[in-house]
Structures are given as C-alpha cells and as structure tokens.
Amino acid sequence: MSVMPSNLSLNGTSFFAENHSIMDKPNEQRTLNVFLFCSTFIIAFTVLLGSIYSLVSLLKLQNKSTISMIVTSLSIDDLISIVPVIIFMLTQWSSDALPQPLCTTSALIYLFQGISSNLKGSLIVSYNFYSINKTETMNCSASKRRVSMVWAILSIWIVSLLICILPLCGWGKYIPTTWGCFTDHASSYILFLFIVYSLCFCLLTVLSVPLTYQLLCSDEQQLLHVNYQEISRGYITPGTPAGCSTATPCLSPVDPVDKTLKHFQNACLSSKAVFRKGVAESSGLEPRCMNNAKSRSFTVGFAQKRFSLILALTKVILWLPMMIQMVVQHITGYQSFSFETLSFLLTLLAATVTPVFVLSEHWIHLPCGCIINCRRNSYAVSSEELKTKHRGFEFNLSFQHGYGIYRISPESHHHDGDGKSTSCHNLLVCEKPYEPPRGGGGGAALAELSTTDSARPGPAGLSATDSARPGPAGFSTTDSARPSAAGVRGEAASGLGRTVEGPERRLSHEEGHKPELTDWEWCRSKSERTPRQRSGGALAIPLCAFQGTVSLQAPTGKTLSLSTYEVSTEGQKITPTSKKIEVYRSKSVGHDPNPEECPNTFADTSVKIHLEVLEICDNEEALDTVSIISNISQSSTQVRSPSLRYSRKENRFVSCDLGETASYSLFIPSNNPDSDINITIPDTVEAHRQNSKKQHMERGGYQEEIQMLNKAYRKREEDGNSN
C-alpha cells in the first residue's frame, strides 16, 4: 500500500510516520471504516433530530428558567456539531484526502463544541449548587439572573473559540485522524486541552456529590404521600391546603427534597407552603398562598435541576475516554484504533442526551425512588426528636391508598390573653382565630363546643355549619360537650350509596376517587384550655395518630359506628403505677340502610369507615401492635361482630373476632404485660339503630349529642343571618 504525502492511505486512514505502523490488513480497515461510518451516521441523525426538538421546545417556553437557557445553548452546540460530523463521514467514506482548510475547519468546530459543552456542564452544576445552598442571595429578580446567565454563556463561547484557534496561531495543528480530523497528539497543546477538561471534571465531581443527594436521593412515594408531619411546627398533612395568616404558622413538608425547594419561594418563605402537584389535585382545593400553576412551576423547576445535573454529568463523562486517549498517546506514543474510534463515538453520544432535559416536565416523578432510593424508614416522634425514635410505620388498606401519620406536640398550644386560639391546622383554611360569640347564654355555651367559626366559609363557600350538618344517609361529628386536654376535631360523614352534593366540597386522600367521607380536621381552640393542662398549655403526653379508610361489606339492616379516642395521663410517660387513662374524645360514623329500599332486597352493601389509631409518643416501650376495634351491630345478636386490628409487623389491618362483646377497644401493648393499656368504651351502635328508626317516625324523638350540637349550629347560623 502506498502512502500519500498527506499521510492518508487510499481508504482515507491516516498514518503518522514516527508513531504509527502501517496497516497490514486493508480489508479489515475497510470493514472498520464501514462500521464507523454507519455508527456516525446513526448518531448524527439522532443528534440532528434531538437538537431541533430541544431548541423548538425550549424556545416555545413562555417562562424560561435560568437552567433552560443553559440547556438551550447546549442544544445550539449540539446542532453545530452536526457540521464537523458530516465532514468526518466524508473522510470515512471517501478514499480521497480532505483539503487541509476543510480538515482544519471541521476539527476546530468539533473541538469548539466539545469544550463549550464541558464548560457549560460545569456551569450547570455550579449554578444548581449555588442556587440551592445560597438561598439568601437569590432574591434578585429573574430578569437579572437571566441577563447574567446570557453573559456567562457568551463568555463560555468566547473562551472556547479562543482555545480552539490556538493551533491556527502556531501552538499545535489540526491533522487527519482515523475517524476525521483532530489536533496533533505530538504537540503540547494536548496537555493544555487536558488541563482545561480536568478543571471542569474536578469542579463537576466536587459539586455533584452533595447535589446528587439533594436532587436525586429521595423517594417519590414519600413526596406524594407525606407520611410523617409535625403539626405543631406547621407541617401539612396529605391533601391539606395551607391556611396562612398571622395566627397560623406556615406549613412546610418535612422532606429532604422539598427542603431544597427553598430557593423558589424566598419572598414567601415564612408564609407559603410547597405543595406537590399530586397533593394539590387530590385535595380538590386551591392553596391560599399559591395557585396550582405556581406550585406546578416550582415542581417543574426542581425537576429541571435534577435532569440538568444528569445532563451535565453525562456530557462531561462521555468526553473522558477521548481525553485519556489523547494524553496516553501524547506521553507514550501508543495508539489503539479501536479505542480511538470508541472514544470518538462516545463524544458524539454526548450530544444526544440534551433532549432528556426537555422531558423533565413530563418525568417529574423520576428519578426519585427509581435510580436512587435513600428513604429513611424512621421518624422522630417525641417532643425532642433526637431522644426518642419509634420505628416508622405506614399502611395501605385493601381499597385505599390514602393515609397520614400525625404528631401533636406539647409545644403546639399557644393562646393569647384575650382567649383567642392562635394555632389552627385543619383541612379548612383558617383565616382568623376563633372568636367566642357575643350572644347570650346559648352562644356562650357553644363557645366551649365549637372549634371553628361557624360563619367562616369552608372549602367551596361551605360554612362550618353546613359541613357539620348530618346528611340523610350519615352522621357528621364535631366536638363533644365535655372539655378536653387537646381538642382534635374530626368530621366524618358517610355519603354511602348516594351522590354527595357538590363533591368538590369534600376532601379525599385518594386521588381520582369520588369523595364519600370528609378527611379529618385537626384544630385547637379555646376548649383545650382546661385545668387538666400542665403549666405551658400543653398536653401531658403528645399523641401520635395514623388514619386510613377501610371498606367493609354490610348487608341491609346493619348499622356501623366507629369511635376514635385520645388518651392522656398526668405523667410524662406511662408506667405500671400510673395507668389511669382518660378518654376525652370520641366520634362516630353511622350508616343507615335506605328506608325507601325494599326490605326484602339487599341494597347499598358497601360501607366505608375511617379508622384512626392513637399511640402515646413518649412511651419508651416499643409497640408491637396498635389495635382499634370496630363492632358492627347485627340484626341477629347471635352473629359475632367482626373487628379490625392493625399489626405493624404485618403492616396491615387484620380481622379478629371479639366475641359477643359490644364495645370499642383501644389496646396499647408494651414490653411489660403489666403496663398494657386496654381502653373499653360501651358501644353506641344500638343508639344509632334506634335513632335511625325514630328519625322517620317522629321528628322530636331521641337525638344523640352530636345531632343536638348540629341543631345548635344551625340555630346559631340562622340567628346570625337574621341579625
């Protein structure tokens, strides 16, 4: 084979006289060149489509973020790289040598886009690290940040161009290679390029270590379902809108990923809550502090940071083999055609990953819980988080996926001198503290019963009175008349077998599910300030609770009733000698068969109830199981009532047989059998059954306490409207 003066063989393969031996197998060389040509063509076509798609998508964005501007410039670099690749394909296919000006131009453009991409990868990582960890300096307007970033991008292009024209000034030169044209490996200019790349690589490595944890190391399930929330410090529950006011501390999810969203809301850091898109949609309510569109933009912006980090890491790492090959060939003179070809193809692949960033808006849930899962399955549940930790637990019931774990802390109760409540975290937006009515004795009595202003509008203009009013097929609950150490108000109404009027007024933990039960409402009011409270206005023992929804099948004629209880004691922890437990809260969910249905038919057998289990957080004993028993009143007293027990070991509710006892039990076991707590309350199911019959017979018949309270609410509202 003859060698041309331009060091090109007839098939276009370059040879360097001092450093390279002449190929003895031209057929294999031609085969490798065909493979190289086909691979280059496929990658180049992919880069062309991807860069056009990225540019069009990014330029169509109305609100361009700083990161999207950098990625737009990367798409321009990818589009520019198509020019030298096309020239390289001509070199690989043709047996003629390229003119030196064309070879120099293609090598310069190829090196320019490579240096520019690596520098911009470092810029992306630096900006992400700066914006996340320096939140106090991010108060400047978005327009100023965009202008600064434009100058940074222009500076990178200028620096990259200056580096690439150095061979034209005499330092090194561009010569043909086996795959196209590149710099002469014998020149010290190669070392300069390697130093520039090493600086970018080192900066990217140092900053990406903390960013990887902050942006990628999380569990999306924990984001969409906030399992553990601390109400006393202003944390929200799943499906709960924020109520921001001077009397209400701001809500903020406890989540390592959400903490990194601080830079999005510096102006409202103390008055706004970050809502995940799924939570905002499942609640059916628009947060008061920010609309869904803004919350969506926050989530998309955070996803852009995730994918931009992946994009920067991929681009810089794919250029690493090329840089290693250049330095090794410069120092040792060793050349491997296969490794050199592979390095070239990897640099082309670096230009194909840019469109992944555009898909970040559609892949918000990735890569959390997919690529890296660093979920911590433990939660601090005591008032001092570093002291007492219980094993975290969660549950998914058969037909439901909505759940929440709550904590009521001793520090959560604050009230001012005029008797107004200053802490309220509930599912209805609290815009003002509770103010006792100025009416007569009846109104004064109601002041101890109500935990929220009945005149205050609810989620969709629904007043508290309306939401507390029982429906034809269910009971609604609110505070009992007796004072409590911590008022936790639960409203649960079962619109079972019926269409609830205005379903948008209801809340549900289950996305896309037609709400049939309202979620629990947590609120602290004046009724808590009782002599049983310790000095500081707090619970003697903070309470933990988890709740869920379970579906049961009940034939017509049965009535279901569920009660939940809170427990408290005078000591700071439960001991065998201090076992006096006071039950001061209960609520029921009733279900009556439709009286219009034929008594001989089985109609409306689907019954849905809420279960809520409470445990004492400061109890140092490990709890194996927490049980709440719900009995079903049967038409025949001979049939035993099914009950449910939640087992944390089995992570589910299991059915248990309680015999013929008609009562509700809350069992809190401990390691010491003598210190087990077993609370038994007489069943109220029979009262529901009797009441459901009398409701249709006489309007002034037997009424339960909750119905009388609802009646008082309605009378109070009517008096307010008349005044």
Swiss-Prot record:
Expressing tissues: Specific expression in peripheral nervous system, including nerve growth factor-dependent sensory and sympathetic neurons, as well as enteric neurons.
GO cellular component: neuron projection; plasma membrane
InterPro entries noted in UniProt: GPCR_Rhodpsn_7TM (IPR017452)
Disulfide cysteine pairs (residue numbers): 103-181
GO terms of biological process kind: neuropeptide signaling pathway
Keywords tagged on the record: Cell membrane, Disulfide bond, G-protein coupled receptor, Glycoprotein, Membrane, Receptor, Transducer, Transmembrane, Transmembrane helix
Cytoplasmic-side segments: 53-69, 128-148, 210-306, 360-723
CDD domains attached to this UniProt entry: 7tmA_GPR149
Residues glycosylated per entry: 7, 11, 19
Segments on the Extracellular face: 1-31, 91-106, 170-188, 328-338
Positions of the UniProt region annotated as Disordered: 451-513
Membrane spanning stretches: 32-52, 70-90, 107-127, 149-169, 189-209, 307-327, 339-359
Main location: membrane
Protein's UniProt keywords contain Translocase: no
Membrane topology, as annotated: Multi-pass membrane protein
Function of the molecule: Orphan receptor.
PANTHER family: G-PROTEIN COUPLED RECEPTOR 149-RELATED, NEUROPEPTIDES RECEPTOR
Listed name of the protein: Probable G-protein coupled receptor 149
